[in-house]
Amino acid sequence: MSIPNEYIAKTEDVAEQVIKRGKNVLPTVARLCLIATFFEDGLRMYIQWNEQREYMDMSWGCGKFLATVFVLVNLLGQLGGCGMVMARFKVDIAVGLLFFIVVLQTVAYSILWDFQFLLRNFALIGALLLVLAEARIEGRSLFAGVPSMGENKPKNFMQLAGRILLAFMFITLIRFELSVWQVIQDIIGSILMVLVVLGYKTKLSALILVALLTILNLYHNAWWTIPSYKPLRDFLKYDFFQTLSVIGGLLMIVSLGPGGVSMDEHKKKW
């Protein structure tokens, strides 16, 4: 057992060095990845303004006015929310706005009846919770010398909920194919995701998952290789940016750590 433990220790040291060197840019990169799907969708609402209005009118029979309101709310809500998150301005309001958009689209596009897309939306909500937790941590750091008994509890539970919800994204990536590579990929990914949820070796597990998801995303969702006239391009593009947002959530875990409700934190107390 000493060899695996030594190997894990060395890997953790390498991961810590990577995190230390990138600590100044990591939160910004995490936020940028996290808002990617919202920014892309908000931009699509602008570019495909007429198509989106017609789709909503045909799907729900709600009339031109309500269809226009839906598209406008999605456009302004997502682009505005993204701008506020990146500027770190009223982050709680920005997260609430983006959360509302996720719920609105879940109902409007009948995602409730599509289990895979529903899980991905849960993962997005998890990523948003981690942004909110980061904002709480930054707020506390301004009053570092002031006692804050019990004030960290909401933040800790946000981080726990964020970790659990992010796991739903990986569930959608599990493919039940009879190939050695696919089975190995599913097993390794599942183990890493369980470790992230439990908060054990969290930063290392999340960092490896970031690398794994990035490779899978570039391989499976290479939308730029598909001609623009093919519907598959839009589907892969949607998939690509949603996965990128979850990668942003994992990077946020790498930056913040697992929080108080985790095995890593309990180990420190032991």
Swiss-Prot record:
Motif (Di-lysine motif): 267-270
Identification of the protein by name: Surfeit locus protein 4 homolog
Transmembrane segment boundaries: 65-85, 93-113, 115-135, 178-198, 206-226, 243-263
GO process terms (BP): Golgi organization; protein transport
Domains as described in the record: The di-lysine motif confers endoplasmic reticulum localization for type I membrane proteins.
Primary subcellular site in the record, as a coarse category: endoplasmic reticulum
UniProt organism field: Drosophila melanogaster
GO cellular component, one term: endoplasmic reticulum membrane
Topology of the protein relative to the lipid bilayer: Multi-pass membrane protein
Family per record: Belongs to the SURF4 family.
Pfam families noted in UniProt: SURF4
Function: Endoplasmic reticulum cargo receptor that mediates the export of lipoproteins by recruiting cargos into COPII vesicles to facilitate their secretion.
Compartments it resides in: Endoplasmic reticulum membrane
Signal peptide: none
UniProt entry keywords in alphabetical sequence: Endoplasmic reticulum, Membrane, Protein transport, Transmembrane, Transmembrane helix, Transport
